[in-house]
């Protein structure tokens, strides 16, 4: 069995995520507490109720009140990563490890923490800054993201190029798998492109609930500020191979990690290439750790005869341990 751990990105979050894990496992609770201490945010309340409040050192206090803070980029990134890293603690306790780690967008950070290239403290702190900058350092305007299904990425690139030449702003942002590409841009360009994609044979187009044109040049100001935070961090050699989002290759010891992770904000995510590399490496068991089932869903569309495992609650975690031990 050759295992890859996969860490989800934004869009997979939902209120209540991780609550049963927090209540059952002391190790999970400790990870939430550590992340809360680093960020100053009560991450348990953020995940379980969708409400952001300051962390004052207490355990989670049960409440029926809910809010919409979890969907804000500055909160989503640290919340999803914390849940993923908490689940990892239970897997490690059961001596379940991966040969390869990777993630989608923010998911690359828990992958690097698992791989040993980044400490827990630095990773969570970086995600706090990254989420804040990606939300607050956008050019003025209304933006949107659109998933395009059933149209070749080369055709999508061609349509985007033509619209850009006409003065519109729209670019490919996520190459999820061979048959699905996400584009980012201003709202009017997205609306126009949506019609053109369908006219050119797209089976489906879906507008995504995101707050900005992520993974495009629109985030250049955010990138330039973020690199200052990255330069404060020391990256380690690591002990598990981690695949980069920007080009679908492994990190190596000669890489400039600061430069790559800064570039990550303004570059498309090449998860299609990530899948191809895992296939070439002979991975046969893919374990998605955290909320949602997006990444295993992409792999299911591309690869046959592989094991797909999702871990997002107590039941799925216990089942995974039985399979993987």
Please describe what each predicted stretch is.
Residues 267-283:
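A short, acidic, amphipathic alpha-helical segment used as a generic capping/interface helix at domain edges
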Residues 207-210, 279, 312:
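Short glycine-rich catalytic loops that host catalytic nucleophiles or stabilize transition states
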């Amino acid at each position: 069995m050759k295992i890859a751990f996969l860490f989800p990105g934004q869009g997979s979050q939902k209120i209540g995520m991780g609550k049963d894990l927090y209540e059952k496992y002391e190790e999970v609770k400790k990870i939430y507490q550590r992340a809360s201490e680093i960020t100053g945010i009560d991450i348990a309340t953020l995940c379980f109720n969708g409400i952001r409040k300051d962390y004052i050192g207490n355990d989670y206090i049960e409440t029926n009140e809910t809010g919409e803070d979890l969907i804000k980029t500055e909160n989503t990134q640290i919340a999803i990563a914390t849940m993923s890293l908490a689940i990892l603690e239970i897997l490690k306790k059961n001596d379940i490890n991966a040969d390869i780690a990777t993630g989608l967008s923010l998911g690359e950070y828990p992958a690097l923490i698992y791989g040993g290239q980044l400490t827990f403290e630095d990773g969570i702190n970086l995600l706090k800054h990254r989420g804040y900058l990606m939300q607050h350092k956008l050019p003025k305007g209304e933006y949107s993201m659109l998933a395009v299904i059933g149209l070749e990425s080369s055709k999508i690139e061609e349509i985007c190029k033509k619209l850009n030449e006409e003065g519109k702003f729209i670019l490919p942002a996520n190459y999820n798998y061979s048959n699905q590409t996400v584009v980012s841009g201003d709202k009017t360009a997205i609306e126009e492109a949506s019609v053109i994609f369908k006219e050119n044979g797209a089976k489906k187009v879906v507008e995504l609930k995101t707050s900005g044109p992520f993974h495009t040049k629109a985030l250049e100001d955010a990138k330039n500020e973020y690199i200052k935070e990255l330069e404060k961090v020391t990256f380690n050699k690591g002990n598990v191979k981690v695949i980069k989002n920007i080009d679908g290759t492994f990190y190596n010891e000669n890489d400039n990690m600061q430069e790559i992770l800064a570039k990550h904000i303004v570059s498309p995510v090449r998860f299609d290439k990530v899948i191809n590399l895992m296939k070439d490496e002979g991975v046969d068991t893919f374990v998605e750790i955290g909320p949602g089932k997006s990444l295993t869903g992409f792999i299911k569309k591309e690869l046959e005869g592989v094991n797909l495992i999702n871990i997002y609650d107590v039941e799925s975690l216990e089942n995974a341990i039985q399979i993987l031990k």
